[in-house]
Every structure is written in C-alpha cells, then in structure tokens.
Amino acid sequence: MQEHRQKYVWSFWIISIIIISILYIGCTNGNPFQYREDVAKQMSLALQQKDVYCREKLNHIDSIRNFLNTNIKRMTDEEKFQVNANLYNEFKLYSFDSAFHYATQLCRIASVIDSSAYMVSAKTRLGYILARGGLFKESLDSLSSIQIEKDALPAKVLADYYISFGRVYHDLADYTKDDVFSSRYNQLGNELLTESLPYLSDSSTVCYVKGKIALKENKLERAKQLYQQALNLCDTTDSETLSILLSTMAYINRNLELDDEAIHYYVKAAVNDIRSATKESVSMRGLATMLYYHKNDVNLASEYINEAFEDAAFYGTRHRINVIGTLLPVFVGEKLDI
C-alpha cells in the first residue's frame, strides 16, 4: 500500500503543477460574480483552520488507540470489534490505508466471534473501503461473496449492506461514464438501494435512499425534493451524512443549471469536509469546477482544485486522481481553444 501511496503523491505534485499552469493560461478579465467575496471568506476561514481540525482528529484517534492498547487484554471479542469499528470509522474518509487495515482487523475479529451479523458487518465495511480507494473489482468481489440470510440478520446490518453495495455500483457508474456499462451499474445500484428500504427506520435515510434512486433515474426535481427532506431531517452532527447530502444537492442543482445554488451547497459541503478533516470527498473539486467554468474565477478555482488534489493524494484515492488525469486534456483544450 505504501508504494502505491508514494506513486500517487508524485502524481499529485505533477498534476498540481500542470493544472496551475493551465488555469492561468489565457486568463480573461471577466468581472467577479456577485457573491465572490462571501464564498472566498467562508472558504478562507475554514482552510486557515484545516491543520487544526486534522490535529484534533488525530488526537481523538490516538485516544481511541490508547484505550484499545490499555484495555485489550480484558476486552471481549465483541468489545474489540466495536473499538476497531470506531477506528475504522475515524479513518474511513481520512486515510485509505489505515481504514483498510482496520477493516481487515474487523474481519479477523468477526471470524473469532463466529457470528453471521458480525461477519456481514465486517465484510461490508471492507467492500465499502475498497471502493473508496478506487479498487472497484476487489470491492465488488468482496461484497458479492457475502452470504445474506435475511431472517438471521439485524435490520441495520442488512440496510448497511444493501446501501454500501448500491453505492459501490453507483460510484463505478460515475467513474466509467459511458453509454454501455454505466446505465447497467446504475440499475444494479438502484436495485440494491431498493432492497434496503424495508430495513430502514430513520426518515432522513429513507429520503436519502429514495433521492439517490431518483437521481440515478435522472428525475432531478424529485431527487432534489427528497434530498432537501433528508437534509431537513438529518443529524447535523453526522458529518459524513451531511457531506453526502450537501454535495449531492450541489450536483443536482448543477445539472438543473442552477449555478448559484450549486455553488452555495458545494461551499457548505466543502466547509463541512474541512471541519471534519474529511479527505475523501468531491465537494472541493466540484466547487472549483463550478467557479472555473461557470464564474470564470481562475484564482479561487486554482486554489480549491489544488486542495482537492492534495486531499486525494493524502487519502490514496486512486480513482479520484485518475479522473483528474482525464480532465487535464479538457482544461488544455478549453484554455488554448484546441
């Protein structure tokens, strides 16, 4: 894993240099958009504290690790599973290598407990994190290998399994972006999300799942309505869920050609990601793209796209970096008119 990390760190620096150069080529002198200063101020205040938020997260992780190391000999296997799950959750959107490590630990502990619920929960986490790192085949292989006995599993375990599996197919469709496979991946993702609905009790999650299905069916207005309901009902202290809802609202508004609303939600999502020390995210890249293509703000766009590259390289997000690589010719053609 470390060799892969070094390779992608080098890729990050090379891409950063190229993209900065491209962004400044042929810069036009368009007027700043109406609320530019408000966007810049919100982002600047958050970015100034970015290192502080990361240190706070690492301190929290250290406290969990210290607790585990101090008490591990007198813990039950179920207690060990829970603490390792807490560490997995802390790293899930912060560092791929560390999250992968704790996912494998969960699988090991689950095999000792010898419980189908614990094993499904552990393998679901492993499959999910493999996709976050861009290892889609390995993710699908892992999730497909899970034996589901609906009558023997708790509702939460079943819901997490179907939602995670569905999200992997949706992410693969977004990464593939073609006219042949993407539609099939989206269909499979929707089928899995639909399977989760009978096991959900939280109204916000129900709205999120239904909204995601509507989005993948290109029912944008319906998706927007459902995501707004999910936002109104969600626990705002759950930074991961909040980021998903905000960034998806931005994406929906972008596709509805409501640029100002899209930027509004991308800013809220990006600030939330910074405050929660989230490295695996699309909000910063989405904001940079909106500012560059729709507001012609090269300066802010270049700053935020570099933040996105830095986070992707830190996390080890292979598919995010690959997507950025495919965008480079687009930037070149746009700026040089070729």
Model-predicted segments: where are they?
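Bacterial N-terminal signal peptides
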Residues: 14-22
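A "functional boundary" signal
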Residues: 9, 24-336
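N-terminal secretory signal peptides that target proteins for export/translocation
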Residues: 1-7
